[in-house]
């Protein structure tokens, strides 16, 4: 059994080679003034539980979880935060002193902190449109609600899935093609940008939009953000700040140190 001298962390996914988490967490460690290990672990489909068990048995202190294992991580955890219970998914595993695993979900914190602290746009009292009804959107709704927006509307190509989330969280649902009216904040949680696609929404909904936000980052966010900008959105942003923000919240849960996300966002932009 190999034990490690430094505090050891990892991100589990499949695929995971593209993950920027190691660079982000090493920047956090520099802020704290400590040395850590942070690695990418590509778990086999069907082998996630064993991979996590091996990691923690050999000195792992905490782990991030990305697709496709967030729901499996939820079931693997011995206890859960309220956020994780509401989201039904876990992106952060914390190894407790009693040997148990605690599951949390920091995606919503990452999104909300990026919008309110980095982009300087208040969520309280605003109208929010969420595009998509998958796990990414479900994971952020609980924290968005904590910020007390005036209204949250979820729009999805398949109405039934949107209505399921609407009933679960006490928000509104509409078919994507029927979206109308202005929104202060429009958040794209669909994955269409990976294929160059944008959600089937009318351009006039961006006329009074203070922020159009895509939860993915880089080239995949460009189609939606270009469309939003051309349609009148005052400000646009990809999900890099959300990525760094959720990582910072995970780091704080593991180590009790809250990193400053702003310089790390700038560092990641420069890579």
Curated annotation (Swiss-Prot):
Active site location: 70 (proton acceptor)
Q: Which reaction does it catalyse?
A: shikimate + NADP(+) = 3-dehydroshikimate + NADPH + H(+)
Q: Which GO terms describe its cellular component?
A: cytosol
The top EC class is oxidoreductase
Q: Domain of life of the organism in this record?
A: Bacteria
InterPro entries, from UniProt? Answer: Aminoacid_DH-like_N_sf, NAD(P)-bd_dom_sf, SDH_C, Shikimate_DH, Shikimate_DH-bd_N, Shikimate_DH_fam, Shikm_DH/Glu-tRNA_Rdtase
* Binding, shikimate: 19-21, 66, 91, 107, 217
Question: What keywords appear on the UniProt entry?
Answer: Amino-acid biosynthesis, Aromatic amino acid biosynthesis, NADP, Oxidoreductase
- EC number annotated for this UniProt entry: 1.1.1.25
Q: Which GO terms describe its molecular function?
A: NADP binding; shikimate 3-dehydrogenase (NADP+) activity
Q: Which Gene3D superfamilies match?
A: Leucine Dehydrogenase, chain A, domain 1 (3.40.50.10860), NAD(P)-binding Rossmann-like Domain (3.40.50.720)
Note the Pfam families from the entry: SDH_C, Shikimate_DH, Shikimate_dh_N
Residue ranges spanning the membrane: these are none
Q: In which pathway does it act?
A: Metabolic intermediate biosynthesis; chorismate biosynthesis; chorismate from D-erythrose 4-phosphate and phosphoenolpyruvate: step 4/7
Q: Which GO terms describe its biological process?
A: amino acid biosynthetic process; aromatic amino acid family biosynthetic process; chorismate biosynthetic process; shikimate metabolic process
Entry-linked SUPFAM superfamilies: Aminoacid dehydrogenase-like, N-terminal domain, NAD(P)-binding Rossmann-fold domains
The record's section on CDD domains has:
NAD_bind_Shikimate_DH
State the similarity comment: Belongs to the shikimate dehydrogenase family.
Could you describe the subunit structure of this protein?
Homodimer.
Sum up the protein's function in the record's words: Involved in the biosynthesis of the chorismate, which leads to the biosynthesis of aromatic amino acids. Catalyzes the reversible NADPH linked reduction of 3-dehydroshikimate (DHSA) to yield shikimate (SA).
PANTHER family, sorted = BIFUNCTIONAL 3-DEHYDROQUINATE DEHYDRATASE_SHIKIMATE DEHYDROGENASE, CHLOROPLASTIC, SHIKIMATE DEHYDROGENASE
Report the HAMAP family cross-referenced here: Shikimate_DH_AroE (MF_00222)
What this protein is called in its record is Shikimate dehydrogenase (NADP(+))
Record organism: Neisseria meningitidis serogroup A / serotype 4A (strain DSM 15465 / Z2491)
């Amino acid at each position: 059994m190999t034990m490690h001298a430094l505090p050891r962390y990892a991100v589990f996914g499949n695929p995971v080679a593209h993950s920027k988490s190691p660079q982000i967490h090493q920047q956090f460690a520099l802020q704290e003034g400590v040395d850590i290990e942070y690695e990418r672990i590509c778990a086999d489909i069907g082998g996630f539980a064993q991979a996590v068990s091996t990691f923690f048995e050999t000195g792992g202190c905490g782990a991030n979880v990305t697709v496709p294992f967030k729901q499996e991580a939820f079931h693997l955890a011995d206890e859960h935060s309220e956020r994780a219970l509401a989201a039904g998914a876990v992106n952060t595993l914390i190894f407790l002193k009693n040997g148990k695993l605690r599951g949390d979900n920091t995606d919503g914190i990452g999104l909300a902190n990026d919008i309110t602290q980095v982009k300087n746009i208040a969520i309280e009292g605003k109208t929010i449109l969420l595009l998509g009804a998958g796990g990414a959107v479900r994971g952020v709704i609980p924290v968005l609600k904590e910020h007390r927006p005036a209204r949250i509307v979820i729009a999805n190509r398949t109405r039934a899935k949107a209505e399921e989330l609407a009933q679960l969280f006490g928000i509104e649902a509409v078919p994507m093609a029927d979206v109308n009216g202005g929104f202060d904040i429009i958040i794209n949680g669909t994955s269409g940008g990976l294929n160059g696609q944008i959600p089937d929404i009318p351009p006039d909904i961006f006329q009074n939009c203070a922020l159009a936000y895509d939860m993915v980052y880089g080239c995949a966010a460009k189609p939606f953000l270009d469309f939003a900008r051309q349609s009148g959105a005052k400000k646009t942003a990809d999900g890099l700040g959300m990525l760094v923000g959720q990582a910072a919240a995970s780091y704080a849960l593991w180590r009790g140190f809250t990193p400053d996300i702003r310089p790390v966002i700038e560092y990641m932009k420069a890579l």
